[in-house]
Amino acid sequence: MASSSSSSSSITIITTFLFLLLHTTAKKTYIIRVNHSDKPESFLTHHDWYTSQLNSESSLLYTYTTSFHGFSAYLDSTEADSLLSSSNSILDIFEDPLYTLHTTRTPEFLGLNSEFGVHDLGSSSNGVIIGVLDTGVWPESRSFDDTDMPEIPSKWKGECESGSDFDSKLCNKKLIGARSFSKGFQMASGGGFSSKRESVSPRDVDGHGTHTSTTAAGSAVRNASFLGYAAGTARGMATRARVATYKVCWSTGCFGSDILAAMDRAILDGVDVLSLSLGGGSAPYYRDTIAIGAFSAMERGVFVSCSAGNSGPTRASVANVAPWVMTVGAGTLDRDFPAFANLGNGKRLTGVSLYSGVGMGTKPLELVYNKGNSSSSNLCLPGSLDSSIVRGKIVVCDRGVNARVEKGAVVRDAGGLGMIMANTAASGEELVADSHLLPAIAVGKKTGDLLREYVKSDSKPTALLVFKGTVLDVKPSPVVAAFSSRGPNTVTPEILKPDVIGPGVNILAGWSDAIGPTGLDKDSRRTQFNIMSGTSMSCPHISGLAGLLKAAHPEWSPSAIKSALMTTAYVLDNTNAPLHDAADNSLSNPYAHGSGHVDPQKALSPGLVYDISTEEYIRFLCSLDYTVDHIVAIVKRPSVNCSKKFSDPGQLNYPSFSVLFGGKRVVRYTREVTNVGAASSVYKVTVNGAPSVGISVKPSKLSFKSVGEKKRYTVTFVSKKGVSMTNKAEFGSITWSNPQHEVRSPVAFSWNRF
């Protein structure tokens, strides 16, 4: 017994030692912030200096000079600790953050039939370059046709990289640049690629990057469709703008070290707009690589558009909340793809589908639900269905946990002949169409509840699935997508996020020939276009619109373009009713839709804009509980003077208001507007208050003698007596208007942080 116990103890000690050894020596990618000005004269470049501080030159992944000051390196924890303590020039070290993707009717829906129809933006938008950070590009897509495009702008300093599956000659006057950044990803994957399809190349083997880049600036392609659905002319928002793609997302996600390197390069390459349909959790701005890179872009006049995330309708789920980026949520179009389930009890259930196969004939089939190999058979997870039960039948699957298209594949592989995917409370009444591998439709929660009850109560329930193609002029629209992430902003609650919503449900755009439309390996279909949903799809809409505004108003700053899109956004749908939320069909609010749905026609001439300088953003950062070191990490300056900081972050000259009372009853903000309309203009204010808050604006009238003139006004918000501090929020608006313009700012009120 003693010998056995001793042996067991020895094994335990050895196992523990090996675990600790592996744990302490395991290498990771770290991002290292350095005092840029400390470089000794003995080193010619910062790259040489950084390399000298590492044990091995191969440990250095990227040197950052523009979007960030420092480098990224592949180190173990001991090396990282040693590096931080070895030099006063090393200011901060943190692990490489992982971000995820936020996955042709829209021009007409947005009123872009002819590039606004009032300005000749064709020639001027030729000079606009939109940089897209995503999964790369499929250059053979017809959406990158460069017919009649003039020569590439001389300001362009970028490249089209060759790779094992990508020839630099594939770029042209439309797709002018293509680069890939994979060092962070490769290190996280053990030094190589985790998928046989991936290589060091800008080639898009996922489809997402081709979809987003063609949405932003794809050339017009006639007779486009997705397997017969959404037929028409497919085109991006800025059809004459140039596209530069930066591949930063790979099979396991998008790493901050790669994103920073791409942003660094894109700024130096000369892009005018950066579009990022990706993001992660909320982090302080000094640890948010996207926010850090975007600050440098903004300072150099580059507009940055980011997706809000797909974690809705969960409260406080919005990502990419830095005030110097445009944060974009998603709404529906006035186009739908209806499908029906004709039940054996005579009822007809309405849903949506992009199924394009031969169908299931005219004979109803038996329905089954929640019967299989495990308790999770209701979700149709892999391995959960018993083929002896579902073979030859239609399976009802609850939405959630695994991908929607995977559920259809699980049903098909188990022998099922059809599927009805029914929403639960988490997704409410939102309907997203998918191109399943078998006849399948998606239905909302209420319809799903009726369906589940029918299957349970009928001894032999049956259904016949019917597909009706494409329908236009759907009412009401837009509706806020249930998946679209919501405020309040958890990093700085005094800044309202998201900023706007744009089209993000069932969007047709270009696709990669390397993968089927479902993204599943077993999907052998290939199509030039695909229909996708997500804030990933709404973000490039705004990126393209920003490019058009940049062409129309080259003198406008990124914050002026952002203001124009925000203050002209609308909050009434095509039935003239307030915007609704697809999650539960309730009225939407600014935590879901921000300032509203973008209206590019009105944004072209907003009347007034809220401009914000770099110095004002620094005053904003100084008002946060950040150290000077943290602020320097974001603004990349040798030192920062916070003597003129805002007393409240909400004092930033933002086009919307988010009032956090906390323990106060009175909050007062001053804003400054710039006249970009006509000379001799007069605007009067209209206040739409909230039940628990009094709002007063002084002055109540703004008179402008000239274009470019600036005027200030002050708003006082008073929480009425007797209002208890609760988690509830209330909303209102402040609108400056004259016969030609309405400049609207939403206001959100909260009494505690979250």
UniProtKB/Swiss-Prot annotation:
The active site is at D134 (charge relay system), H208 (charge relay system), S536 (charge relay system). It comes from Arabidopsis thaliana. SUPFAM superfamilies: Subtilisin-like (SSF52743). One of its GO terms (cellular component) is Golgi apparatus. GO terms for molecular function: serine-type endopeptidase activity. InterPro entries: PA_domain (IPR003137), Peptidase_S8/S53_dom (IPR000209), Peptidase_S8/S53_dom_sf (IPR036852), Peptidase_S8_Ser-AS (IPR023828), Peptidase_S8_subtilisin-rel (IPR015500), Peptidases_S8_3 (IPR034197), S8pro/Inhibitor_I9 (IPR010259), S8pro/Inhibitor_I9_sf (IPR037045). This is Subtilisin-like protease SBT1.8. Residues 367-452 form the PA domain. Residues 195-209 have a biased composition (Basic and acidic residues). Residues 29-102 form the Inhibitor I9 domain. PANTHER family: PROPROTEIN CONVERTASE SUBTILISIN/KEXIN. Glycans are attached at N35, N223, N373, N641.
